[in-house]
Amino acid sequence: MADYTAVVNVTGEGRNGGRVQSDDGHLATTLALPKELGGAGDATNPEQLFAAGWGSCFLGAVRLAASQRKVRLTSTAVDTEITLVHGDEGFGLAAVLNVELGGVDQDTATALTEAAHQICPYSKATRGNIPVTINTTAV
């Protein structure tokens, strides 16, 4: 399998009024501070983009883990929460992944999410760097 590099250009004011554009044109949007941080909240923000990337990658890792174990899932969903926190050392991130897996019992669902957390590149990149909580529910 080949490597892949995403290239995104960010211009303007960054997270507060900036614009992002991928080199292939598939991603093109403006950024705004959320209302909770005193911004207009009228555009996406880096935390939402990170949550979308991690959540989609994590579900792919869950599907891979299920396939490797010959487990059939009837549904997969994740609500990914990325929190921008401000502490003594400045700004940081915290994450919560709320995973729902259908067609399996709770023990299997938990085992699959634990395996996915070892497979997913976003999980690997954040491991030991930010607090991460994974809540798994069999549905």
Regions found by a protein language model. Give the residues of each.
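Extended beta-strand/beta-hairpin segments
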Residues: 1-55, 59-139
